[in-house]
Amino acid sequence: MMKTLSSGNCTLSVPAKNSYRMVVLGASRVGKSSIVSRFLNGRFEDQYTPTIEDFHRKVYNIRGDMYQLDILDTSGNHPFPAMRRLSILTGDVFILVFSLDNRESFDEVKRLQKQILEVKSCLKNKTKEAAELPMVICGNKNDHGELCRQVPTTEAELLVSGDENCAYFEVSAKKNTNVDEMFYVLFSMAKLPHEMSPALHRKISVQYGDAFHPRPFCMRRVKEMDAYGMVSPFARRPSVNSDLKYIKAKVLREGQARERDKCTIQ
């Protein structure tokens, strides 16, 4: 199955198995959108704008193979619990963000981590077993200093203790401290190409009307070890119906993969 993205004179076909969604969750004013902005364009915005829900898409050409990463930057207020549950169900990798100078935001991350594990476990019919999920818990604003800290490092690290699919980082989106390292570890845990990390691919800047022109991206000759990444200016949040179909297809693929593994072992 291929996902086809079309614009202008160019068509990009991304295999379904190479399409992923990253979901960013946390309380309001903890810096979720700032971390996403660092990932997409390396910039930091000082002005705070409340997020209802932002959707972004980044397309990669890594050694000739196409990959797609959708990024869902969620609201910290979560006025619609059903939509947040749907966002969790569609997620492949997760970033849970709290502010090191805000104890309540850390408590929210603990609740979110529990909810994600419960929702994903139910999806896999493993209600008594934690789902294996690539997840980073991110303590943001470490540039504020120790006097402002309300969450000890040792306490935050307990949330990831004993889980090889979960890691903890203290970062500063403002100073761009540990942000690249955090994404590198997250993608490594998810078994995604390392080149999807912000620092490990060439960024292609494109004009809105020329985003998928053959020469800048999809028909460009790439060297064997080259990796390119491009933020799509046309990304739209999929409909609820599309998300439900996405979940169904993902569960089906995972089931088929487990059956293949059983046959191989036998």
UniProtKB/Swiss-Prot annotation:
Signal peptide: none annotated. The modification Cysteine methyl ester is found at C263. GTP binds at residues 26-33, 73-77, 140-143. Keywords: Cell membrane, GTP-binding, Lipoprotein, Membrane, Methylation, Nucleotide-binding, Prenylation. Pancreatic endocrine cells (islets of Langerhans). GO terms for biological process: locomotory behavior; positive regulation of phosphatidylinositol 3-kinase/protein kinase B signal transduction; positive regulation of protein sumoylation; signal transduction; synaptic transmission, dopaminergic. It is a lipid-anchor. GO terms for cellular component: plasma membrane; synapse. Residues 189-235 are annotated as: Interaction with GNB1, GNB2 and GNB3. A lipid is attached at C263 (S-farnesyl cysteine). Residues 264-266 form a propeptide. It holds the Pfam family Ras. Belongs to the small GTPase superfamily. RasD family. PANTHER family: GTP-BINDING PROTEIN RHES (PTHR46149:SF1), MIP08469P (PTHR46149). NCBIfam families: small_GTP. This is GTP-binding protein Rhes. It comes from Homo sapiens (Human). The gene is RASD2.
